Curated annotation (Swiss-Prot):
Residues 12-286 form the tr-type G domain. Its main location: cytoplasm. It comes from the Bacteria. This is Elongation factor G. Belongs to the TRAFAC class translation factor GTPase superfamily. Classic translation factor GTPase family. EF-G/EF-2 subfamily. Disulfide bonds: none annotated. It comes from Thermotoga neapolitana (strain ATCC 49049 / DSM 4359 / NBRC 107923 / NS-E). Keywords: Cytoplasm, Elongation factor, GTP-binding, Nucleotide-binding, Protein biosynthesis.
Length: 695
C-alpha cells in the first residue's frame, strides 16, 4: 500500500463526505464496497456476517447497525476521499449532527423499493440545516419491488428536493444488470463476480428509445439551472458532456440540485460510477465559503480560508477512548498547518495542549502522519482537555468556531455497580463514555446516592450499559427506565425574597422582588434573565448572583422536584445594605423569591412526547392502532408505502417502554418502528397527580 505521505494531494482533489441513510438502506454495505474498489480492503466485508470495516464495535457487528461514525480515508483516480460513516438510527442523531457539521458533501443512500423512509427525512433535514451538498444513490435495485422512478419521486414529494437522474437502470429486481449513463449515453455492465471489472457498451436497441427520453428529461432539468445551457437547449444545439457536468456540479454545490444514481451495492453493481460522481459533483474544501469564527480578544467575526498560510483553525467533532492509545480526538482542519509534537490552543477551554501524534483513521486501523493541512480529517493523541465541539487554533490568533448543538436527553436509568470492585471502574468508564458522547449525561442523585444515566432513547442507554460490560468490564444492575419530566408555569406571578441575618459581626442582607413569566414553547428558550431595576436599588455586581440563585432553584420544581423550564425571570425591585449585602445573601434571596413566585404561577408538569413511525403489513394495522390508543397516542397520519402501511403518531414517552416487544407480538415480528423525541407537553391532570404522589 502506498504511504499516506506520498499521497498528500492538492486541496481541489480532496472530498470530505458522509454517507447518510435510513437504518436499512444499505449504507454500510455501500461504504464497504467503496473501500474495496478504492483498494483499501482485500476482501469485501458483509454487514450480515459482521465483518464490515466501518461497523467495528462489537454491538454494531451484532445488531447490524452503525453506531459510531468512523472516519476512513481512501483514494480514487488521484483524489483523496475522506468518508465519515454516520448512523441511521434515530437514537444516534447526535452522531449524525456532528458528522454533518464537518463534512463538505454527502451521498444519501436510499432503498429503491421504499424511496424516502422516515429516518431519511430526519437526516436530510439535518443536512439541510448545515447546507451540505448531496448526491443520491438508489440502492437495492435487485430487490423485489425495486422501482427507481418511484423512489426518485419520493425525493420530490417528501423532501422537496430537485433530483436529476443522471443514470437509468437496466432491468430491475432479479433482472437488474447495470446502468445507462445518460450523460455519456453508454451502458455499463459489471462482468466479474466481485464487481471490480466493468465495461461500457453501446445501449441495447430495446432500451434506446427510453434512454433518449430520459436523457431529454435530464437535459430539460439541467437547462433550468443555467441561462447559457437553456439558450442552447431551446435552440436545439448540442450540449457537451463537460457542460452538463459543470452546470450540475455548480447546482449541487449550491444545493439547487441532487444528481441521482442507482445500483445494488450488495451485488457489487453501481459503485464505481458513484465514486466518479463524488468527484464530479461534490465540493472540495476550496468550493465552500471560508469558515466563520469569532476572535477571542474582541469578539469580532473572522473568516478562515482553506489555506496553509492562514492561522491554524480546526473543530473537534468526536472523541473516542481507544483501549491501546488512550484518548483519540477527531478534528477537521479548516485553515493553517499543524505538525505533530507542536502546541495547539484550545480556545473553547482556554488551554494550551501538545499534540503528540497525528493519525489518519481507517475504521479501526491507524496511519501515523507528520502534519495536517486544510481539508484534512484526522485524529490527535495527547489532547487531554479537548471535547466535542471545541475549537483548536493557533495560540497567537485565538478564535472560536460555532459550537455543535446537541439535544437534551429525554430518558434516564439508575445504574449501580454489581460488586464493590466494579464501583471504581464504573466511575472511570462513565467518564470516558460521556466524553465520547455529548448526549449521554451522568449524574449522582444527592438523596439516594444512585448513579443516573440519561440519553436519547431506550436503545441508546441499552448500548451504553452493554459497552460498560464489554469494553470496561463493569457489571451493573439496571433500574427501570425513567422519564425526564419537566415543570413550567402557566401564568405570570410576582414574589419577594428577603434574606437577613443579624449575628455578631457582619450580617447578611439580600432583598429581591421578582416577576416570572412563561416563555412560549415556539421561542425555543428555557430561560431568560432580565434586570429591570432602576436607580441602583440593587448594585449591578449582585445581578450574576441573583441569576445564579434563580438557576439553582430551577433545578428542582415545586410539584415533584423536576427541573423547571421555559421561564423568564425579571428582577423588578429590591434593596441592599452598604455593609451586610453579599453575593451569597442575594443568591439566597433570589432563590426564595423564585420558589415563592413558582407556587403562585400555576405550575404544571411537562412530559416528553415522541414521534413514532410504524411500518406494518396492512393486516396488523387495526391491532396496532388499538394498542396505540391505549397508550394515549394521537395518530397523525396513515400512509401507504409500496405494499406496506405507515402509521405516524405522537405518544408520551412514558407509554412506550418495552414497545418493541409489544409490536413484535402484535405483528408476528413483521412490523418495525422508529421513534424520536418531538416536544414537551403538559401532562393531563389525572396522570400528573399520580406522578406527583409517587415522588
Amino acid at each position: 500500500m502506498q504511504s499516506v505521505e506520498a499521497r498528500y494531494v492538492d486541496l481541489d482533489k480532496i472530498r470530505n463526505i458522509g454517507i447518510m441513510a435510513h437504518i436499512d438502506a444499505g449504507k454500510t454495505t455501500t461504504t464497504e464496497r467503496i473501500l474495496y474498489y478504492t483498494g483499501r480492503k482485500h476482501f469485501i466485508g458483509d454487514v450480515d456476517e459482521g465483518t464490515a470495516t466501518t461497523d467495528w464495535m462489537p454491538q454494531e457487528k451484532e445488531r447490524g447497525i452503525t453506531i459510531q461514525s468512523a472516519a476512513t480515508t481512501c483514494f480514487w483516480k488521484g483524489y483523496r476521499i475522506n468518508i465519515i460513516d454516520t448512523p441511521g438510527h434515530v437514537d444516534f442523531t447526535a452522531e449524525v449532527e456532528r458528522a454533518l457539521r464537518v463534512l463538505d458533501g454527502a451521498i444519501a443512500v436510499f432503498d429503491a423499493t421504499a424511496g424516502v423512509e422516515p429516518q431519511s427525512e430526519t437526516v436530510w433535514r439535518q443536512a439541510d440545516k448545515y447546507n451540505v451538498p448531496r448526491i443520491a444513490f438508489m440502492n437495492k435495485m435487485d430487490k423485489v419491488g425495486a422501482d427507481f422512478y418511484m423512489a426518485v419521486e419520493t425525493l420530490v414529494t417528501k423532501l422537496r428536493a430537485n433530483p436529476i437522474p443522471i443514470q437509468m437502470p437496466i432491468g430491475s429486481e432479479k433482472d437488474f444488470q447495470g446502468v445507462i449513463d445518460l450523460i455519456k449515453m453508454k451502458a455499463i455492465y459489471w462482468t466479474s463476480e466481485d464487481g471490480s471489472v466493468y465495461e461500457e457498451r453501446e445501449i441495447p436497441d430495446e432500451l434506446k428509445e427510453e434512454a433518449e427520453l430520459r436523457r431529454e428529461e435530464m437535459l430539460e432539468k439541467v437547462a433550468e439551472l443555467d441561462e447559457t445551457i437553456l439558450e442552447k437547449y431551446l435552440e436545439g444545439e448540442e450540449i457537451t458532456e463537460e457542460e452538463i457536468k459543470k452546470v450540475l456540479r455548480k447546482a449541487t454545490i449550491e444545493n439547487r440540485a441532487v444528481p441521482v444514481l442507482c445500483g445494488a451495492a450488495k451485488m457489487n453493481k453501481g459503485i464505481q460510477p458513484l465514486l466518479d460522481a463524488v468527484i464530479d459533483y461534490l465540493p472540495s474544501p476550496l468550493d465552500l465559503p471560508p469558515v466563520k469564527g469569532w476572535r477571542l480578544s474582541d469578539g469580532e467575526v473572522v473568516y478562515r480560508k482553506p489555506d496553509e498560510n492562514e492561522p491554524f483553525t480546526a473543530l473537534v467533532f468526536k472523541v473516542q477512548v481507544d483501549p491501546y492509545i488512550g484518548k483519540l480526538v477527531y478534528f477537521r482542519v479548516y485553515s493553517g498547518r499543524l505538525e505533530k509534537g507542536s502546541y495547539v490552543y484550545n480556545s473553547t477551554k482556554g488551554q494550551r495542549e501538545r499534540i503528540s501524534r497525528i493519525v489518519f483513521m481507517h475504521a479501526d486501523k491507524r496511519e501515523e502522519v507528520d502534519y495536517v493541512r486544510p481539508g484534512d480529517i484526522a485524529a490527535g493523541v495527547g489532547l487531554k482537555a479537548s471535547q466535542t465541539g471545541d475549537t483548536l487554533c493557533d495560540e497567537k490568533e485565538p478564535t472560536v468556531l460555532e459550537k455543535i448543538d446537541f439535544p437534551e436527553p429525554v430518558i434516564s436509568l439508575a445504574i449501580e455497580p454489581a460488586t464493590k470492585s466494579d464501583e471504581e471502574k464504573l466511575v472511570k468508564a462513565l467518564l470516558a463514555l460521556s466524553e465520547e458522547d455529548p448526549t449521554l449525561q451522568v449524574k449522582v442523585d444527592k438523596e439516594t446516592g444512585e448513579t443516573i444515566i440519561s440519553g436519547m432513547g431506550e436503545l441508546h442507554l441499552e448500548i451504553i450499559v452493554d459497552r460498560l460490560k464489554r469494553e470496561f468490564g463493569v457489571n451493573v444492575r439496571v433500574g427501570q427506565p425513567q422519564v425526564a419530566y419537566r415543570e413550567t408555569i402557566k401564568k405570570a406571578a410576582e414574589a419577594e425574597g428577603k434574606y437577613i441575618r443579624q449575628t455578631g459581626g457582619r450580617g447578611q442582607y439580600g432583598h429581591v422582588i421578582l416577576r416570572i413569566e412563561p416563555i412560549p414553547e415556539e421561542e425555543g428558550k428555557n430561560f431568560e434573565f432580565i434586570d429591570k431595576t432602576v436607580g441602583g436599588v440593587i448594585p449591578k455586581e449582585f445581578m450574576p448572583a441573583i441569576e445564579a440563585g434563580i438557576k439553582e432553584a430551577m433545578m428542582s420544581g415545586p410539584l415533584a422536584g423536576y427541573p423547571v423550564v421555559r421561564i423568564r425571570a425579571i428582577v423588578l425591585d429590591g434593596s441592599y445594605h452598604e455593609v451586610d449585602s453579599s453575593e451569597m445573601a442575594f443568591k439566597i434571596a433570589a432563590s426564595l423569591a423564585f420558589k415563592e413566585a413558582m407556587k403562585k404561577a400555576q405550575p404544571v408538569l411537562l412530559e416528553p412526547i415522541m414521534k413514532l413511525e410504524i411500518t406494518t403489513p396492512e393486516e396488523y394495522m387495526g391491532n396496532i392502532i388499538a394498542d396505540l390508543n391505549s397508550r394515549r397516542a394521537k395518530v397523525e397520519a396513515l400512509e401507504t408505502r409500496g405494499h406496506l402501511k405507515v402509521i405516524v403518531a405522537k405518544v408520551p414517552l412514558s407509554e412506550t417502554f418495552g414497545y418493541a416487544t409489544t409490536l413484535r407480538s402484535l405483528s408476528q415480528g413483521r412490523a418495525s418502528y422508529i421513534m424520536q423525541f418531538s416536544h414537551y407537553q403538559e401532562v393531563p391532570e389525572k396522570i400528573a397527580e399520580k406522578i406527583i404522589k409517587v415522588v
